[in-house]
Amino acid sequence: MDREELQAVFDQKCASGYDQQWSKIAPLREALHLLVGAVLSDLRDDARILCVGAGTGPELIYLAERFPGWRFVAVEPSAPMLDVCRRKAEERGIAARCEFHEGYLESLPPGEEFDAATSLLVSQFLLDREARTGFFRGIADRLRLGGFLVNADLSSDTSPAAYQSLRGIWYRMMQAGELTPEAIEKMRAAHDRDVALLPPEVVGGIISAGGFDSPVQFLQTGLIRAWYARRV
């Protein structure tokens, strides 16, 4: 999926109902955030955190409330999604510790190195493997030596039987989340067309090639897997 397509998908209509749409499967997000917080919990009290593809800001909000001394930079190309993120931060009284950058990582002005970066369900939209490696390299360039990357993406073993079985469970879960059959069918088509759903070892190799040590997988919830790695 190219940049224009991504911005068309995550438009004003999407942003206004995004959090509500996924509220029924919030336990997946909550488990991810709980473990992300554990991975990063030893950072300094005034750590700087880069949130790449911040969307409506769920991980930023969670981490900012859990770690009241941390400072955040949210990078998000969709203006409507970033507006929701900013509004939520203002409502919770944490906006003073946040910067909001509309655009991509390469357009973020140079600044102090970050202690950690999050990229949750972002790199999966980069279908070209070289571009995906470059995405992680861009994050590594913003981190201090030894800084953490926490990354989550849709990922699955690609043996036909295992993948189809897990995929079936995934869509049945979406039905329980009250998505309409039409919405689920659109999701199926998008996964086939617009998501680079790769085996976990391949995703780990791409992260390493982007300037990180060997990633450690710390979570799997259905098709979502998450890793942490450190900049080398």
List each language-model region with its residue ranges.
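Core SAM-dependent methyltransferase catalytic element
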Residues: 210-232
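Conserved class I S-adenosyl-L-methionine
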Residues: 1-44, 148-176
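A short beta-strand submotif of the Rossmann-like class I SAM-dependent methyltransferase core
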Residues: 119-123
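A short acidic, Gly/Pro-enriched loop at the edge of an enzyme's catalytic core
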Residues: 109-117
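A short glycine-rich, Lys/Arg-flanked "PGG" loop and its adjoining helix->strand segment in the class I
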Residues: 133-145
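Class I SAM-dependent methyltransferase SAM/SAH-binding core
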Residues: 48-52, 56-107
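Short alpha-helix
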Residues: 193-210
